[in-house]
Structures are given as structure tokens and as C-alpha cells.
Amino acid sequence: MTNVGTVRTAFVSGASRGIGLACARALAETGVHVVLAARDAAKLEQASSEIPNSTWVTIDLSSADSIKEAFAKAGKIDILVNNAAVTKDGLALRMKKDDWDSVISTNLTGAFLATQQVLQGMMKSRWGRIINISSVVGEAGNPGQANYVASKAGLIGLTKSLAQEMASRNITVNAVAPGFIETDMTAVLSQEVKDNIIGHIPLKRFGRAEDVAAAVRFLASEDAGYITGAVLNVNGGMYM
């Protein structure tokens, strides 16, 4: 197992289910204290009860005040996983501005504001790991998801800029770009749609949340200390 360390604290947004929950579990297995964050308090409490050495806070990534409050409760953070995301799909021609703003606000601006909350502490301790969960569509594009794609592509740009700004303080900033993963978001797809997607994946299957979590666990570890500004694709070869 890739060891992160026993004195670190990780903050994982969108941690009540899916990829975020898998990331929280994977990091906890390395001995770090994990702060689970999401909107749903009941789901967070249940998830935290199943993960040793974890706590939870509610957070609304579309609200600057909520972000500040959540990180004030969480305390000093050594590892930040910006995972929370929403979708409001639609063709660009008909997309409402509110749907654009909502997705960008949560997925991109929320990640930026969360990152701002942890930078000072990381800089002071001269150690930090920031891992942004992007998406294969942030690299390849996808029709009907202009807002979501823009937010995920923006996370990659944010990752690269922050990596250059923070390198001198021994803070690494990387992105993980999942492909199609078995989550609540993909469970609603028809079998016909799933089969069509799998036909474009060289490994011929959807990924698991644990596949993404393994990449996050590695990037959070000491073993990944010389990796920064990278985008780690976890997509079964769908996009290269």
C-alpha cells in the first residue's frame, strides 16, 4: 500500500458517495485523518461512521461563506481533494445562464475557493497535496455538456497554474481525469448507451470508484513527491 503518513489530515469534497467516498476510504486506509465534506449531513454521518479516524462537515461549494465555515471547522489541511461536482446538461444553444453559472460555480469556482482556504497552512508547513478531480470530457469535450466540460477543463488549467505557483513550497498540485465510472451518475444510463460507450473503451468496461481512489491515494503520498502539474487519466484507454 502506498503510504501517505499518519500525521496528515485530508479534506475530501463530495465525499458522501461515489468517487469522493472511495477517495476518503482509500486515504483513511493509509493512516491519515479524513474530513468528509458534502451537502447531505445524514449521508456524511453514515459514511464517517464506517471510516475509522474520520470526521465530517457540511459544505456548499457554490457558497463562499459555506466554504469558509467548513474549513474553519476542519482545521489545518495537508491533503485537499476537490471532487464535488454537479451537472446540468443541455445543448449550448438552449442552455440557460443559471445552468451555466451553477455548474461553473460549484465545480470550478468552488474548487478554487476551497484551495485558497488551505494554501496558507500548506505554505507554512512547506508540504501539501492538492488533487483536483477533472474528467475525460475536460480533455476531449462532449456535446450537451458545455458548462460541465468548461468546468472540468478549467480545473486542469487551475491545476497547472497552481503547480507552478506552489512548487517552491513543496506543495504538489495534480489532477485526476476519470472516464466513465460506475456511479449514481452512470447508473441511469440505458444498457444500449452503456454498451455503446464500452465499445469505445479499450479495456471494455466502466471503471470503479476505487480505480480513481487508487490514483488519488498515490498522488497524495510521499511516493508522488516529484509529480506536479500532471493529469492522470483513469479512463480505460478511452482518451489518450
Where are these regions (language model features)?
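Substrate-binding pocket helix/loop in short-chain dehydrogenase/reductase
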Residues: L91-A92, K96-I104, I197
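Active-site helix of classical SDR
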Residues: T115, S151, T159
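Alpha-helical segment proximal to the catalytic Tyr-Lys
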Residues: Q120, Q164-S168, G225
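Active-site loop immediately N-terminal to the catalytic Tyr-X3-Lys motif
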Residues: L93, A140-A146, S168-R169, K204, ...
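Short C-terminal tail/terminal secondary-structure segment
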Residues: T6, A140, R217, T228-M240
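Residue(s) in the substrate-gating loop at a strand-loop-helix junction
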Residues: S135
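Conserved glycine-rich cofactor-binding loop
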Residues: S16-R17
